Amino acid sequence: MSNVFDGDSPTNLAEYSVSELSGSIKRTVETAFDQVRVRGEISGYRGPHSSGHAYFALKDDRARIDAVIWKGTFSRLKFRPEEGMEVIATGKVTTFPGSSKYQIVIETLEPAGAGALMALIEERKRKLGAEGLFDAARKKRLPFMPGVIGVVTSPTGAVIRDILHRISDRFPVHVLVWPVKVQGEGSGEEVANAIRGFNALEPSGTIPRPDVLIVARGGGSLEDLWSFNDEIVVRAAAESAIPLISAVGHETDWTLIDYAADVRAPTPTGAAEMAVPVKAELEAQAAGLAARLQGCMNRQMDQRRQSVRALMRALPSLDQLLALPRRRFDEAATGLGRGLELNTINKRRGFERVAAHLRPDLLAGRIAERRQTLNERMARAERMVERLIDRSKSRVDRAEAILASLPARLKTQTDRGRERLGNLSRHADTAVRHQLTRARSELSAQDRVLQSLSYKNVLKRGYAVIRDEDNRPVSQAAHLSAGMGIAIEFADGRVGAMTTEGGTPPAGAKKRSTKPAEPPKQGSLF
């Protein structure tokens, strides 16, 4: 300090160094403004610094003052500062001697009245609404009966207990709780991350993806609920692919997440009631529907029973149903017997007509051929009878299928008819087989007669057949002349011989022609 008694000094003012003056100002300001309340608009806010401190300014229409909130104080704020928000800051004013600047160190911060916050909410609401985040077309329907419910709320307090208790009472399901802070610094980010985290789960993963989400918080002041007005929370709710129920505060409390959610519940308990139905009511409804269904089925059964009775009255009796098939079967069986008998008679007559003109060896071959043909026809006749019987049985089976739904009385008549038809089938089969056996017996007898008429059987009894040089049988001595070569056929072979004299022909007998005779024409057995 200079000498105050120096005669050259124009005044008696004390002289300060820059440091002394800055320190004196600092002490004066901090003493005079140790605790002040300042109203102003937040300006230049960019969120907390990496150190955790927040730096911004408070301004009005004529002045501006720098402000700082230390990390410890910032974490205790009830709401998050935002650019343009009008607030009331409480703290002390201090200066920095090194730069000749002053600032307010904020100890508490509160909105400058509810009107300021509401104005900010309205401005944000208009902005997000213009982007379509609140459109009704984005809303999703809640599932009727979710299997898993995700809850985003504080893990402590009455809210989560009320939700779990209400869900357990109404319809117990699996509940996943994502614990978050519901107010204070960082609460908005935690709520948004929880919503996105639930949406990122795989439906078939180890932790199942919820079918519906509940974002809940208890009641509080506008500042307490401010996190749910945060833009990041609103966007996360609007982007959620899982239907979301907002249950923030009481019924009169509205936040921006309520507009972005698919459904707003007045309270957390109301959200639980919206998420699941009442199991007892569902059981009662199911019982009522079952009773109505049973009544409907009973009415349908009565109607069907009456229809069956009407059909039974209109349906002809079993005898009427089987009359035509039975008559056709009888006609076929009778016609078959008569046809076989007539055919056998005709064949016998034809055989008798041509038997005299047939040579035994050729006749035996023809008989074998005809026997084979007859056997084939008999086999075809048997197959035809079997097919006729099968068709009759098929008709009876179809009649049985129609009659199967009729009362027991009609079924008894069907059984009796089936038994009669079986007897008729067996009688017809027996009759046909008897006719075939008799025809075979007659044919065998005729074959034996034919064999007995063969000249070879006569030769076996000591007779012989004499044939001329042309191998023709000689039945009279007059047909031979002296010196003619002949063949004598015995039962075991032939021998040649020569006549020594000719026979004397009887009176009126024509001389035998020496012209070779034509072989006799073979007659046909059929």
Curated annotation (Swiss-Prot):
Entry keyword set: Cytoplasm, Exonuclease, Hydrolase, Nuclease
Record keyword Cytoplasm present:
yes
Determine if Cytoplasm is one of this entry's keywords: yes
A Gene Ontology biological process in which this protein takes part is: DNA catabolic process
Q: Which residues cross the membrane?
A: none
**Where is this protein found?**
Cytoplasm
Reactions catalysed, as given in the entry: Exonucleolytic cleavage in either 5'- to 3'- or 3'- to 5'-direction to yield nucleoside 5'-phosphates
Q: Which InterPro entries match?
A: Exonuc_VII_L, Exonuc_VII_lsu_C, OB-fold_nuc-bd_dom
Assigned GO CC terms: cytoplasm; exodeoxyribonuclease VII complex
- Location, primary (coarse class): cytoplasm
Gene Ontology molecular function terms on file: exodeoxyribonuclease VII activity; nucleic acid binding
Identify the stretch(es) annotated as Disordered: 497-526
EC number(s) given by UniProt: 3.1.11.6
The record's family statement is:
Belongs to the XseA family.
Q: Which NCBIfam families match?
A: xseA
Give the function comment from the record: Bidirectionally degrades single-stranded DNA into large acid-insoluble oligonucleotides, which are then degraded further into small acid-soluble oligonucleotides.
Quaternary structure, from the entry: Heterooligomer composed of large and small subunits.
What the entry lists under HAMAP family is as follows: Exonuc_7_L (MF_00378)
Tell me the protein's name: Exodeoxyribonuclease 7 large subunit
